[in-house]
């Protein structure tokens, strides 16, 4: 997917990008490739692959959820900034918070945010387990996203404490897994969430599968969650 194809395919979905936004995506691509030579940010570095599997993939969340107003979104374990930074470029009024446990990624993201001139983006070097216990962040976000390989029961413990009541946790997955969702339902309920739906679609050109698991926060998460670093992964809620 070349940049102009990216623009046209988003326009077909009702998302019109300005020349300035296209320039920001171009800067993003070049910074990603440049910094990737110093640190391992992504295995995907070809321009057409980055535009498809990082940029388009991230913005595809907006095909199913409304990011057009000044909502607050927290991206847990954002890595090189996906999906939150592409969403921020497309929807400048979003308030974005990113938490990542690797300081080198935060260093890259700080440079990226500055170079792209993005306002209202906060970056935190922290473990999700400790970040989620901080009063100013608990129940503070309209949307919390995770584009990670961890299982849904683990991700739910890291993400749901941050979601405000009636807000949403959006888990981006590469494949459909009813078994994984069913396994996670007790944890989701314990954490105050409710499974809403799973949306499946395919990326253009490659037809790679993508799935978004949508979980709504219905009540406050008990104070004991998230547990200490490492525990959610070692002993998932059953």
From Swiss-Prot:
Matching InterPro entries: rRNA_ssu_MeTfrase_G (IPR003682), SAM-dependent_MTases_sf (IPR029063)
Domain of life: Bacteria
Residue span of region Disordered: 217-238
A Gene Ontology cellular-component term: cytosol
Compartments (UniProt record): Cytoplasm
Primary localization class, coarse: cytoplasm
Residues binding S-adenosyl-L-methionine, per UniProt: 77, 82, 128-129, 147
Keywords: Cytoplasm, Methyltransferase, rRNA processing, S-adenosyl-L-methionine, Transferase
Enzyme class label: transferase
Disulfide bonds: none
Keyword S-adenosyl-L-methionine set for record: yes
Family, similarity comment: Belongs to the methyltransferase superfamily. RNA methyltransferase RsmG family.
Record's function text: Specifically methylates the N7 position of a guanine in 16S rRNA.
Name of the featured protein: Ribosomal RNA small subunit methyltransferase G
Organism in which the protein naturally occurs: Enterococcus faecalis (strain ATCC 700802 / V583)
């Amino acid at each position: 997917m070349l940049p102009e194809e990216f623009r046209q395919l988003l326009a077909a979905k009702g998302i019109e990008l300005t020349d300035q936004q296209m320039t920001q995506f171009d800067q993003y691509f070049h910074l990603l490739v440049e910094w990737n030579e110093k640190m391992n940010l992504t295995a995907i570095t070809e321009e057409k692959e980055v535009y498809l599997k990082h940029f388009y993939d991230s913005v595809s969340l907006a095909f199913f959820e409304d990011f057009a107003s000044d909502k607050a979104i927290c991206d847990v374990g954002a890595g090189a900034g996906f999906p939150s930074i592409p969403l921020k470029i497309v929807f400048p009024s979003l308030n974005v918070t990113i938490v990542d446990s690797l300081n080198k990624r935060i260093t890259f993201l700080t440079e990226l945010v500055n170079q792209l001139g993005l306002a209202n983006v906060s970056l935190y070097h922290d473990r999700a387990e400790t970040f989620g216990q901080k009063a100013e962040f608990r129940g503070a976000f309209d949307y919390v996203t995770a584009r990670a390989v961890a299982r849904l029961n683990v991700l739910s413990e890291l993400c749901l404490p941050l979601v405000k009541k009636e807000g949403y946790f959006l888990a981006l997955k590469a494949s459909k897994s009813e078994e994984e969702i069913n396994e996670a339902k007790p944890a989701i309920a314990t954490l105050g969430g409710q499974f809403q739906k799973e949306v499946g679609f395919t990326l253009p050109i490659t037809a790679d599968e993508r799935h978004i698991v949508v979980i709504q926060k219905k009540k406050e998460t008990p104070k004991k969650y998230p547990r200490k670093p490492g525990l959610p992964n070692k002993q998932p809620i059953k």
